[in-house]
């Protein structure tokens, strides 16, 4: 068992990584799909200090696989650590994204469907309904008793224009218990610092950096749709893609009202393995 | 039954030819005239060939081979279709839109200048 685990790790380490050209977004999805056969391993973290509650680190690790050019599937494992409280595994999610239009258009829709089974989650990968500071005041042992088995759907709209990417997400989430539908939004824009590539190979060329702005928040639920008692965040975001290596992302984000956490610091690392299953078939 | 056999064989052969045509280069027929005629702002520039080579190595080589010779079912980019029949505008269109039913993804996430640099590199392969 131990030998086979080490073998798998060695194979993964020897696999040819790719420059992922990821967008520097933490919450917003762009319409760009994972290339078929590629596996993207991502770790995302959010650090925050809600007023009246302990500082926390919410994390998830994601395995994103390109099944087809028009279908990307992703599995998440979530966890969190709260100061003066505990470190816990908070659950898992499985999402699928489908691109119905097989050519590039001015606006490109993607349908997102996710099942999640979490409790006490603090990764803040989306904000919906009346999510806000009160959720973070509950100690972990109590929050864990509230199991959230949810179906989350998104309409992802994305455009690329003159190097800019503009992405909008409309979110609808339903707890499979008797809770009402909750709604949220996210949008983001970004652009590489330089559009043309350099003739020489370089790690820190301007085209390897992308910068942008991201904003997201809740829109209430079916019975109380709107901005009342909802949280909203906005912040600049940047990433750097190492040549044939990982992409590192960072974003300080700011709560826009008293219902939001005043500041969130997000950082992530992603690493793409090209033609993942080909490794195990002993070829390309 | 036997009387219909030649017609049946003809139909099968025609279907096979049509399937082959669809699987190999049918995308060329779908390129709009405006894209077909686009000119490459980097056409023939040695710096763009070098930059395009770097982009190719990072994003394309795993599927199409280190020297664009093709890998297993992934096609070679040194064929007559790519080097002679397709214009630079055609290749740019293919990179933007992909041929998603055939497994070629869209590369619209790369900025347009990088796509043209990649086209410049691909077109340099026949020289």
Feature names for model-found ranges:
Chain A
Residues 2-9:
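Sec-dependent signal peptide recognition
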Residues 15-17:
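N-terminal signal peptide c-region/cleavage motif recognized by signal peptidases
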Residues 20-284:
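Transmembrane beta-barrel domains of Gram-negative outer membranes and organellar outer membranes
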């Amino acid at each position: 068992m131990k030998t086979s685990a080490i073998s798998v790790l060695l194979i993964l380490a020897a696999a040819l990584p790719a420059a992922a050209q990821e967008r520097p977004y933490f919450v917003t999805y762009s319409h760009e799909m994972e290339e078929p056969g590629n596996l993207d391993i991502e770790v995302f973290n959010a650090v925050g200090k809600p007023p009246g509650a302990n500082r926390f680190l919410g994390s998830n690790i994601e395995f994103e696989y390109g099944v087809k050019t028009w279908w990307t599937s992703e599995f998440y494992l979530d966890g969190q650590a709260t100061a003066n409280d505990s470190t816990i595994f908070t659950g898992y999610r499985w999402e699928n994204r489908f691109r119905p239009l097989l050519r590039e258009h001015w606006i490109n829709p993607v349908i997102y469907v996710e099942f999640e089974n979490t409790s006490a989650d603090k990764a803040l990968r989306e904000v919906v309904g009346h999510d806000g500071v009160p959720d973070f005041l509950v100690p972990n042992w109590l929050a864990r008793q509230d199991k959230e088995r949810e179906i989350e759907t998104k309409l992802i709209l994305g455009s690329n224009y003159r190097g800019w990417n503009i992405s909008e997400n409309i979110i609808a989430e339903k707890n499979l218990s008797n809770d009402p539908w909750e709604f949220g939004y996210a949008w983001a824009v970004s652009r590489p610092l330089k559009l043309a590539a350099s003739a020489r190979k370089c790690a820190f060329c301007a085209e390897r950096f992308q910068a942008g702005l991201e904003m997201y928040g809740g829109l209430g639920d079916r019975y109380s749709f709107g901005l009342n008692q909802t949280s909203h965040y906005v912040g600049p975001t940047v990433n750097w893609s190492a040549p044939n290596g990982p992409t590192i992302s960072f974003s300080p984000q700011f709560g826009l009202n008293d219902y939001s956490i005043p500041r969130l610091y997000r950082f992530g690392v992603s690493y793409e393995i090209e033609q993942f299953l080909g490794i195990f078939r002993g070829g390309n | 039954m036997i009387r219909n056999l030649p017609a049946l064989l003809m139909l099968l052969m025609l279907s096979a030819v049509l399937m082959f045509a669809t699987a190999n280069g049918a995308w060329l027929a779908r390129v709009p005239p405006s894209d077909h005629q686009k000119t490459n702002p980097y056409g023939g520039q040695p710096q763009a060939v070098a930059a395009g080579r770097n982009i190719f190595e990072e994003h394309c080589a795993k599927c199409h081979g280190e020297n664009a010779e093709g890998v297993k079912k992934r096609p070679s980019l040194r064929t007559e279709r790519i080097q002679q029949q397709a214009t630079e505008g055609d290749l740019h269109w293919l990179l933007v839109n992909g041929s998603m039913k055939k497994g070629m993804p869209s590369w619209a996430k790369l900025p347009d200048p990088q796509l043209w640099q990649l086209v410049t590199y691909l077109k340099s392969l026949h020289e």
